[in-house]
């Protein structure tokens, strides 16, 4: 059987201190080092400076965390791949079900994240950084988050909206200057208590990723599509609509005008999940787990 090793991390202290903690961990597991360091001089001085500046403006503390990480490993911060992959210049499924439609009367959030373990951190991380809300979720490039829930019960999940955007081969070139999704998600988890605060912050920050975000707090949820810098937001509450579904294509009319391409499997996964939630009067955790445990086309995996 193919086995993959994962990790649990509990990070506490200042940004710089938790950076040093992570650097010490990687030092003890030296085979992890290559995934953080660029070896081909991909990062120009200007790109590195711009990346640091935008992180300092919108994601305060992450630069300090990276400095602590680099201090522990005795490597230059300029060589960190995070700076190259975070600033972007121009087969996931997820949903939220609000209390009215769940068997426990609590909000349920589901996400199926299809990424190769070869390029994934494989790390579920509980982060308690000074001056930010504590949160737990999966990390990417150690400093980013692919999803999570914070101490106030705010959860954030995402899927690509069409072809993923990035600075590496095979990804769509960004059309605007802005942040990658994993920087945005961590920012939302650390700075926002509820859906309303998250919506306001998303309107402020430059985002280059083409993504579908589902943001939920204990009573409300929002679905946000972002494509080439354009943003469309739909908000629901427990009185009007009980769930939101997203896969890898746009459903809002404004974003569909910009990108109406749909992969067949994305459409099928969307309707599979939507019909399951529509059919169930009361959704259970067990029924959601069954969907993500079954392989496509019967399930979401």
How should these model regions be labeled?
Residues 1-94, 190-203, 218-220, 243-301:
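C-terminus-biased signal that marks the final domain/tail of proteins
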Residues 167-222:
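Loop-centered beta-sheet repeat module
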Residues 220-241:
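Extended amphipathic alpha-helical segments with heptad-repeat/coiled-coil character used for oligomerization
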Residues 113, 160, 219, 228, ...:
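A broadly conserved detector of short glycine/acidic/proline-rich loop/turn motifs that flank catalytic sites
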Residues 3-5, 21, 32, 36-39, ...:
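A contiguous strand-loop segment
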Residues 96, 108, 212-214, 221-225, ...:
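Ordered hydrophobic segments in well-structured contexts
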